Amino acid sequence: MAAPDLSTNLQEEATCAICLDYFTDPVMTDCGHNFCRECIRRCWGQPEGPYACPECRELSAQRNLRPNRPLAKMAEMARRLHPPSPVPQGVCAAHREPLTTFCGDDLSLLCPICERSEHWTHRVRPLQEAADDLKGRLEKSLEHLRKQMEDAMLFQAQAEETCALWQKMVESQRQNVLGEFERLRRLLAEEEQQLLQKLEEEELEVLPRLREGAARLGQQSTQLAALISELESRCQLPALGLLQDIKDALCRVQDVKLQPPAVVPMELRTVCRVPGLVETLRRFRGDITLDPDTANPELVLSEDRRSVQRGEQRQALPDNPERFDPGPCVLGQERITSGRHYWEVEVGDQTSWALGVCKETANRKEKGELSAGNGFWILVFLGSFYNSNEPAFSPLRDPPKRVGIFLDYEAGHLSFYSATDGSLLFIFPETLFSGTLRPLFSPLSSSPTPMTICRLIGVSGDTLGPQ
């Protein structure tokens, strides 16, 4: 047999009788014929048998299909030796027959073989009839799509207009922010200059009087020292020398009258008050309550754990490690390890109190100095403000009724304010905080009104007082 005949026979043996193309995943029926798995599946489209072989029409009760792997290899060899030729337009790719009809169910072009095989139960129409019908449907779809396109273009124009408007609004607000903060900077700079000028005027007004008093005292000290030295020397003289001109010496002693300096008020009239500062700090407000397990037995806490005052007698409470004793202190429940925090405390007319923060690990059982070295950063009021690290400074004309405490953990900043008028009371030197900090409260004296943690609401600075 010639080589071309062998090649032709290989093509014929590797070709499916249904699709007339090389086998794809060939399977064998009970009668021994081979077909592509997908071709025979579509040919046997009905769910129940009997099933007829497309070649010999032999009936089979079940779909017994066995994979034919050798035939699959043969089909692959034939496909490599003789690749399928391109299918001309208008010709069925499966059967190489002219496309003459259109399947309305699968929306596909059919040749006569397709129509008689897997599409024999479908709605099949001539090409021109199907084309005319689909053309009408396409024209309706085009009309709908054109309307959709008009709407899309309108929406696009509106979206672009909205984007431009949004950018304009953002830019306007940006300019408002820049302008407002520039105004605030000018206002703060002017306020700073006014306060510094007032301080300088106070300094120039009071300091000469203080220096005059100090100079006068210096002169008196010099005169007293000279007189003392003279009398000490006279006491060492013999009787004649001691008594000689003694009248003059005694007269000068009797004439000595120490003139104390004039009393100069040590109250600064100028206070550091930044406009709007308290309102800004209230943005960092926290909801702080008292921890009863840390309260000294002499302290009485309210039911809502927001108020504390000295009791009339010591309570019988467990001596747990967290409790302050003997110090009259109580801590807040909140544990601070980062961030900015602000709270306000109503102290009313109490004559002495202490507020601030302390380390979680600070000693609460020994009576010692509540200093930063021991883990305490507190402001104490005893008629004047002071803390354990700084010398006492002069009393205010009007001690605050409400105290604001601001803590910036990362910045190492702790400051105290009069929450009533926003004036600065005290700022601790910059501190490197570490570990957990807790708010500290201490009513140092008995008072009919308690020390109360205020409820702060709203960002604008609106507050609810002690509840």
UniProtKB/Swiss-Prot annotation:
Subcellular localization: Cytoplasm; Nucleus
Keyword Zinc-finger attached: yes
Coiled-coil residue windows: 128-207
Family the UniProt entry places it in: Belongs to the TRIM/RBCC family.
UniProt protein name: E3 ubiquitin-protein ligase TRIM11
Entry binding sites for Zn(2+): C92, H95, C114, H119
Cross-referenced CDD domains: RING-HC_TRIM7-like_C-IV (cd16594)
Domain notes: The coiled-coil domain and the B30.2 domain are both necessary for interaction with HN and PAX6. They are also involved in MED15-binding. The B30.2 domain may be involved cellular protein quality control by promoting the degradation of insoluble ubiquitinated proteins.
Organism: Mus musculus (Mouse)
GO cellular component, one term: cytoplasm
SUPFAM superfamilies: B-box zinc-binding domain, Concanavalin A-like lectins/glucanases, RING/U-box
Subunit structure, interactors included: Binds cytoplasmic tail of integrin alpha-1. Interacts with the HN peptide. Interacts with PHOX2B. Interacts (when autoubiquitinated) with SQSTM1/p62; promoting AIM2 recruitment to autophagosomes. Interacts with AIM2; promoting its autophagy-dependent degradation.
ZnF locations on chain (B box-type): 87-127
Disordered: region residues: 304-324
Gene3D superfamilies to which the protein is assigned, alphabetical: 2.60.120.920, Classic Zinc Finger, Zinc/RING finger domain, C3HC4 (zinc finger)
Residue ranges, compositional bias (Basic and acidic residues): 304-313
